[in-house]
Amino acid sequence: MKFTLGLGSRAWRVSWEGAAAAAAGPGAGGSALRCRAQRVSSPRLGRRGSRLSGALPLCLSRGGGGAQALPDCAGPSPGHPGHPGARQLAGPLAMEQTYGEVNQLGGVFVNGRPLPNAIRLRIVELAQLGIRPCDISRQLRVSHGCVSKILARYNETGSILPGAIGGSKPRVTTPNVVKHIRDYKQGDPGIFAWEIRDRLLADGVCDKYNVPSVSSISRILRNKIGSLAQPGPYEASKQPPSQPTLPYNHIYQYPYPSPVSPTGAKMGSHPGVPGTAGHVSIPRSWPSAHSVSNILGIRTFMEQTGALAGSEGTAYSPKMEDWAGVNRTAFPATPAVNGLEKPALEADIKYTQSASTLSAVGGFLPACAYPASNQHGVYSAPGGGYLAPGPPWPPAQGPPLAPPGAGVAVHGGELAAAMTFKHPSREGSLPAPAARPRTPSVAYTDCPSRPRPPRGSSPRTRARRERQADPGAQVCAAAPAIGTGRIGGLAEEEASAGPRGARPASPQAQPCLWPDPPHFLYWSGFLGFSELGF
């Protein structure tokens, strides 16, 4: 016998005082307690009573030297006509219960089992007599929710039996339904459970009463069809072995030609389809003209040399000179490099382009980084005012000019043949050109951070100009000027002017080209590419 009687439970005992007062009668003050004597009173916490005291309500009275049960406890109370006894039916039923638990009201119940039919019938009878459900709950020691549920079911269906009225729901996951669900899933792997339910109704497999729910279909797909869809070990052994995955298929997404195929042959197969040979080479089918290989010029090189063949280690290792030529093919066609060695020009190859090519980078380089299209020197003005027309730039190849200590070999062909260091006007062969407008001594240059020195300020230039004008003028130039400052200034100007109306040696009129050596190599202020950080 199982009785879970802990500290939280209540062991109901019969109050001897209440029973004695009920037996004494109204004269002894028992009229007020007569009704209460029929029920269990005074619950006491923490005290364990006997099985009968917890389940069998007895109304005891004192008489005959012992306690005896009152015969009218199960019947109506004299003070309350029509009110039946509180424990008229609970006594025999409780005696039949051999196991169970005790609820808060003191009644014995079995968890998970329905209430006995006799108690159900008694609840309905008491309700028909007009007793409130709360009073029925206290009298029969049944929870209020159970009483209300039984009465509501009786009012709706007229039945006091537990469980569903029409019986349990019939089985819906029949083998036929499972077979159709499997067929639907195999035909369309992405089908939803509610779509399967609609197709079962549309095909007449089920009707609206026995069609499985969406959750049932999902459970069938997960438990039954999911396990059946996976092939067994025997079925897996019959399948052909999968092709080995190439290690670089996920990088190169386009078809590859086979090394045994003819040179330049192209394949149109899909990347995942294996080719005729066991090895694959570099790609040949290019999606667009803006790929990385086209930008670097690899496609042009490959079209000239054909598809590379060989082992995987040598398929991607061309010679260095071929790659150097590949890098040049990406640029526009430019003039020849005049016999210079390729390694010497690898670092500066971008600067040997024509002026039109270099003008494209004008937004990224400073103004003094490259000369203008008609300018041969860095510190000179446009060359048309000083140089005679010559062959196009760069001219034919000439003898190399490589003075000792020069870092880069410069060939004479890179300098214009007509770019002499002695102007024809100073030699007297041609008339003097028109005078140019005079500007301040510090003239504008392409690089404002380095102002150009005044023209004619070098002693070597003045001495050479005086020797060219008159060999006997050196003594006059060395002697101090006699007279006022005005006379001395005029004498110096006349001495430096030279014969035949040559141009005066003023800073504004002095040309930019230095006599010797070449100014763009030996001038200390020349802005080379090394100074620009290239």
Swiss-Prot record:
Q: Does the keyword Transferase apply?
A: no
Q: Which GO terms label this protein's molecular function in UniProt?
A: DNA-binding transcription factor activity, RNA polymerase II-specific; RNA polymerase II cis-regulatory region sequence-specific DNA binding; sequence-specific double-stranded DNA binding
This protein's GO CC annotations: chromatin; nucleus
What is an annotated GO biological process for this record, any one? Answer: regulation of transcription by RNA polymerase II
**Gene3D superfamilies listed in its UniProt record:** Winged helix-like DNA-binding domain superfamily/Winged helix DNA-binding domain
Region Disordered: what ranges? 424-480, 492-511
DNA-binding region, residue intervals:
98-224
User: For the region RED subdomain, what residue ranges are annotated?
Assistant: 176-224
* Top-rank taxon, per record: Eukaryota
Region annotation PAI subdomain: where it falls in the sequence: 101-157
Q: Where the protein is mainly located, per its record?
A: nucleus
Q: What does this protein do?
A: This protein is a transcriptional activator. It may play a role in the formation of segmented structures of the embryo. May play an important role in the normal development of the vertebral column.
Q: What is this protein called?
A: Paired box protein Pax-1
Supply the source organism for this entry.
Answer: Homo sapiens
Its organism's taxonomic lineage begins at:
Eukaryota, Metazoa, Chordata, Craniata, Vertebrata
